[in-house]
Amino acid sequence: MRLQKQEINTILQVARHIYGEKVKVYLFGSRLDNTKRGGDIDLLIRTEEEKKGVLARIRMIAQLKFLLGDQKIDIIGDHEDSIVAQEALRKGVLLV
């Protein structure tokens, strides 16, 4: 996994602030491959609380860009009925 512990902590802190303490955040995509360089940060948000929608995602991306630097960050929800969300849950890594 190509995220530093501080980056993981920042992602989790922002996610908990926006989505609540029970949120689960999965990293998926190219950042899981240690042999690659660069790439965006692909996150899947899983929460039991009411779905927050696109505005919550925009807030989270804005806060992460401010705290982590200007990186490409993509966020999807686990409720999305898409192949990408299904693959992210299947192959992604839960951030702790």
Where are these regions (language model features)?
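Short glycine- and acidic-residue-rich catalytic loops of nucleotidyl-transferase/cyclase enzymes
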Residues: 41
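Catalytic core of pol beta-like nucleotidyltransferases
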Residues: 1-26, 32-38, 47-96
